[in-house]
């Protein structure tokens, strides 16, 4: 199997787990400057999947690394969300993280906790496939967008 096919197969296999990660992140309120719980959740997941380095910087952002090559590639996603506004305008609880009809519902699902969940799964796949080479891949999960 070609490497691309392996990656796609793993991504498909982890689809439900990625949705569950997103659901958990949505359930974790993380308004700007109040992201500590979300940062701890992201850190825990990166450690669970064996990332080479995981730390929280002085601002509270999670910095994770896979690989140890000289060239560096960084991919960023923010873990904070904007306020809910008028809760009456929501059809579902904005912090339910409900998974229904192939979608994950809640505050931050598309901006940007969905991207964060995908980044965590991508890092997991890199580790499982033994990524090593010219690059250090940094996944940064930043606060206070």
Model-predicted regions and their roles:
Residues 2-109, 128-134:
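Acidic/His- and Gly-rich active-site-bordering loop/insert found
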């Amino acid at each position: 199997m070609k490497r691309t096919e392996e990656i796609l197969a793993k991504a498909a296999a982890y689809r439900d787990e990625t949705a569950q990660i997103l659901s958990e992140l949505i359930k974790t309120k993380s308004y700007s400057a109040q992201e500590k719980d979300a940062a701890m959740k992201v850190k825990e997941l990166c450690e669970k999947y064996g990332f080479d380095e995981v730390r929280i910087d002085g601002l509270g952002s999670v910095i994770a690394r896979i690989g140890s090559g000289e060239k560096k590639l960084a991919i960023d996603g923010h873990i904070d969300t904007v306020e809910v506004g008028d809760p009456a305008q929501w059809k579902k609880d904005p912090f339910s993280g409900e998974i229904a009809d192939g979608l994950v519902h809640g505050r931050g699902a598309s901006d940007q906790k969905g991207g964060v969940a995908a980044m965590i799964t991508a890092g997991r796949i890199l580790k499982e496939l033994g990524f090593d080479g010219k690059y250090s891949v940094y996944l940064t999960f930043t606060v206070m967008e």
